[in-house]
């Protein structure tokens, strides 16, 4: 059920199919010169992988096609991405820059008439050159353009960046506008010095009458996950001027340890869907993939907060009740815990500590994760309803009807299953 990928960022609907694009290094399961992989699905259960959509082919993107977004304009599919060029090549590894100062980032576009074939030679163009003004953004670290059509018919773009602040940097979102989806003009920006020194993968969207911005800050001062997190904040947003007037708090979208780089789009039913990437520090032994998508979530708004629900088509697929848990197949587990409850699912442990759901994966982790194995939810006010999904070395846990979600990557589960001190029935269902 989890689409395997290096890192996701781009989704859209075309011809009744969901098109999913993702960063992809086709030669190894580690970081390298980024291409765009491409898959389509009608239901997020069955996927068809298509040929690589984007690959480096121009001087301005010769060292990689980083993340971006996709949108249909006048019957054609527009792919926006960050083009990467190194000012100085690294003689020991052509897939990494010689130093951070040698990175050059610009924003580029490819247009396809059928959404399947992308001419990387004739149909590429650089639409926003490398930033020259340091007070606007960073010439090295400005990336992940998200484009949407505004109510007035114009196109807006938000890009993640950073600017110098005191003795460090602070994260920043840059806003651009276009009449035709090709020629963009810088309009506005928003920065916040208290949450990370670089913002990746920004997205602005509306649920009901409330605008939200989501982003993935780097190098936050909040352990245990300074670089594997995504935040959202309700914003008072003027879409005409692309101005964030004020904002609320910025809670986590996912309270697990591996969630990063989410992106939203509208479903066929006009619901706001979210996909995100689960970061992995190393591949599962014997596998050729590293990293995966979460299962898609439907986002809803309640009193200025985001509530997340599993995409109904997937949730309804778990309709066969089983008596025993097997980690060889996906399963759903639903129950209500109390303050003395505990679950041990193959070495992945769940209990309640100080009114919080506590997750520990120390027994099913890797050495590289040794400082990131223990995490807790926010306080739950004595209510501990959980809806847990397991598939492909990952647990996704929805708490109290999607008020919070926690996702965790695990390695090498054992066969042990121990469920203790639950007053309520435990329901386990498979596909």
Predicted features along the sequence, with ranges:
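Entry beta-strands of beta-propeller and related beta-repeat scaffolds
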Residues: 17-20, 76-80, 153-157, 210-213, ...
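Short, conserved, GDST-rich strand-edge loop motifs in beta-rich repeat architectures
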Residues: 24-30, 83-102, 160-168, 216-227, ...
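Beta-propeller domains
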Residues: 14-52
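Hydrophobic, small-residue-rich alpha-helical packing segments that form membrane-like cores
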Residues: 77, 84-93, 97-189
């Amino acid at each position: 059920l989890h689409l395997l990928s290096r890192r996701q960022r781009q989704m859209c609907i075309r011809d009744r199919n969901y098109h999913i694009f993702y960063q992809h290094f086709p030669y190894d399961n580690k970081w390298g010169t980024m291409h765009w992989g491409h898959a389509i699905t009608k239901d997020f259960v069955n996927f068809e992988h298509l040929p690589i959509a984007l690959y480096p082919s121009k001087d301005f993107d010769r060292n990689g096609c980083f993340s971006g977004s996709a949108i249909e304009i006048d019957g054609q599919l527009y792919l926006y991405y960050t083009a990467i060029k190194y000012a100085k090549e690294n003689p020991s590894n052509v897939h990494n820059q010689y130093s951070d100062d040698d990175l050059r980032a610009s924003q580029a576009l490819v247009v396809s008439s059928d959404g399947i074939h992308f001419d990387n030679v004739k149909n590429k163009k650089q639409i926003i050159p490398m930033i020259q003004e340091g007070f606007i953004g960073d010439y090295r670290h400005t990336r992940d353009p998200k484009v949407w059509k505004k109510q007035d018919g114009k196109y807006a773009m938000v890009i993640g960046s950073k600017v110098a602040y005191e003795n460090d940097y602070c994260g920043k979102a840059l806003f651009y506008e276009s009449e035709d989806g090709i020629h963009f003009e810088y309009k506005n920006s928003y920065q916040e010095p208290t949450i990370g020194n670089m913002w990746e993968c920004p997205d602005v969207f509306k649920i009901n009458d409330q605008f939200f911005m989501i982003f993935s800050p780097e190098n936050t001062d909040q352990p245990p996950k300074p670089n594997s997190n995504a935040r959202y904040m309700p914003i008072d947003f003027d879409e005409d001027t692309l101005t964030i007037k004020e904002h609320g708090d910025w809670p986590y979208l996912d309270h697990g340890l591996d969630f990063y780089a989410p992106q939203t789009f509208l479903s066929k039913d006009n619901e706001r869907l979210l996909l995100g990437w689960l970061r992995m520090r190393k591949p599962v032994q014997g596998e050729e993939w590293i990293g995966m998508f979460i299962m898609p979530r439907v986002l809803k708004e309640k009193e200025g907060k985001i509530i997340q629900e599993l995409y109904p088509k997937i949730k309804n697929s778990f309709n066969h009740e089983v008596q025993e848990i097997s980690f060889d197949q996906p399963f759903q587990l639903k129950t209500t815990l109390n303050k003395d409850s505990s679950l041990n699912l193959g070495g992945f442990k769940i209990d309640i500590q100080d009114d919080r759901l506590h997750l520990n994966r120390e027994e099913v982790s890797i050495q590289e994760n040794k400082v990131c194995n223990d995490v807790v939810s926010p306080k739950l006010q004595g209510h501990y309803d959980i809806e847990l999904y397991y598939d492909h070395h990952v647990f996704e846990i929805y708490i109290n009807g999607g008020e919070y979600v926690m996702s965790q990557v695990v390695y090498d589960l054992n066969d042990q299953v121990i469920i203790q001190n639950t007053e309520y029935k435990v329901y386990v269902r498979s596909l």
